[in-house]
A protein has these predicted regions:
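Nucleotide-activated donor-binding/catalytic signature segment of Leloir-type glycosyltransferases, i.e.
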Residues: 247-272
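Conserved acidic donor-binding segment of nucleotide-sugar-dependent glycosyltransferases
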Residues: 324-332, 340-346
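Donor nucleotide-sugar binding/catalytic pocket of nucleotide-sugar-dependent glycosyltransferases
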Residues: 145-187
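Membrane-proximal helix-turn-helix segments that form the acceptor-binding/catalytic region
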Residues: 100-109, 134-154
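Conserved donor-binding/catalytic core segment of Leloir-type glycosyltransferases
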Residues: 194-221, 234
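Acidic donor-binding loop of glycosyltransferase active sites
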Residues: 273-290, 303
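Glycosyltransferase donor-sugar binding loop
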Residues: 25-29, 232-248, 264
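A short, well-ordered alpha-helix in the C-terminal region of glycosyltransferases
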Residues: 348-362
Length: 414
């Protein structure tokens, strides 16, 4: 989600009519993000092209006061929140997490045009896979928090099923569905001829340890190597902040085996090379809490995708016209079978890769930002015409789906 926010900010910064301030949290340590050697990465200096105000702190109950104080200094025209339910705190600090989710409603009540991009909703989260304790109480609190978020001027969700849930269960009138989008402008056509030379690199990338698990993939991969000796498994990304040391345990077990590569946290500038050098992206998750950033980046760099058969990912593939082959959750045999089928067929690789690349052309970051800015402009015009303030104003515009494009759906290779 942080990477997504970075790319939103980069695209907004390109607009000469926009003055952007990024309101970030005060980082003290990032021990959950380690390099290829398992060493925690060091905190970098702020990017010089951005105006960053670090005004809130993770797991702090004082974040509403901190953010409201900062907004009184900035006096923005639009306040845009990029959120998941754990943005402001973990389940070990439920008051801080809940207080943070109330901030958008408070900001709107103070008279600011407020928008939330919400990456998941709790009705679609597998609580057991996400290691949620006291599930009943957590769901009750999440329902109240959702109602608080819906007091924003508008909300964007990244899967159509999420919008349906918010409309049907909460009777929300201010919810948009928009594509997650690729993390960049119009991509360059990849050089397919380089793939598999010398290795077929199978990429798994994410924040590991909770519902994003590696056990199934590592169980499947020895069978892949029997059939495809030049296959190589590349694991990249950080641990989930509640699961330090997770991917490092696999790295220790497979130390010295050159068919396994562990990259750890990958800086944004190295992401293009990581994807471009891969043959396929695998999403071996047990469940999902939203749309998939790695799947969209696979499209951006023209890669086939193999994924656990998760309902949200099927919706994503259909709605955004992705070529994805699915395997039953936790089924290592079927995952291995699909990897062998893909890597042994250059024709199938290119067909899926080209399909995903053309899907990426229809969901670039500039296109997405234009949709957001049009929506913000409409909200501001409505606000000025209404002349009301705060939570008393009811939006006079209807929530819309983003455009969908009549591009063919992916049919599994036969």
């Amino acid at each position: 989600m942080n990477e997504y926010g970075l790319h939103l900010a980069r695209e907004l910064q390109k607009n000469p009519l926009i003055s952007l301030t990024v309101m970030g949290d005060r980082l003290e340590e990032v021990d959950f993000a380690t390099d290829a050697n398992g060493t925690p990465i060091s905190l970098a200096e702020e990017l010089p092209e951005f105006d960053v105000l670090r005004c809130w702190k993770f797991n702090s109950v004082s974040n509403p006061h901190r953010i409201m104080k900062a907004l009184r200094q900035i006096r923005p025209d639009v306040v845009w929140f990029n959120l998941v339910f754990s943005t402001f705190g973990t389940q070990q600090f439920p008051v801080a997490a809940f207080a943070g989710l109330c901030i958008p409603a408070m900001v709107r009540a103070a008279g600011y045009n407020t928008h939330v991009t919400l990456h998941h909703i709790m009705e679609h989260v597998d609580m057991s896979a996400a290691n949620i304790k006291a599930e009943r109480m957590f769901r009750m609190a999440s329902s109240v928090a959702t109602r608080m978020l819906l007091l924003s001027n508008s909300i964007t969700v990244l899967l159509p099923a999420y919008r349906r849930t918010l409309v049907e269960r909460y009777r929300a009138q201010n919810v948009h569905f928009r594509s997650h989008g690729i993390l960049g402008a119009r991509p360059e056509r990849p050089d397919f001829s380089r793939r598999g030379k010398p290795d077929h690199r199978v990429l798994a990338i994410g924040h590991w340890g909770t519902y994003k698990r590696l056990e199934t993939l590592f169980e499947a991969f020895p069978r892949v190597l029997e059939e495809i000796p030049n296959a190589k498994l590349v694991v990249a990304g950080a641990n989930h902040h509640t699961m330090p040391g997770y991917w490092e345990s696999f790295a220790e077990k497979y130390r010295g085996n050159d068919r396994y590569e562990f990259r750890g946290y990958v800086p944004e500038d190295d992401i293009p090379g990581l994807y471009a050098s891969s043959s396929v992206v695998v999403l071996p998750y047990n469940s999902s809490t939203g749309s998939s950033g790695p799947a969209h980046q696979a499209c951006q760099y023209g890669l086939p995708i193999i994924s656990s058969d998760i309902p949200e990912f099927r919706d994503m593939a259909i709605d955004e016209h992705m070529a994805v082959d699915f395997f039953p959750i936790g089924d290592a045999f079927e995952l291995g079978k699909q990897l062998v089928s893909l890597l042994s067929s250059a024709e199938k690789q290119q067909a899926m890769a080209e399909h995903n690349f053309f899907a990426a052309l229809r969901m670039t970051m500039p296109q997405l930002i234009r949709e957001y800015l049009r929506s913000f402009d409409l909200q501001e015009r409505t606000r000025l015409m209404d002349g009301g303030s705060g939570l008393r104003r009811a939006a006079s515009w209807s929530a819309n789906r983003s455009r969908t494009y009549p591009y063919g759906r992916w049919a599994p290779w036969t």
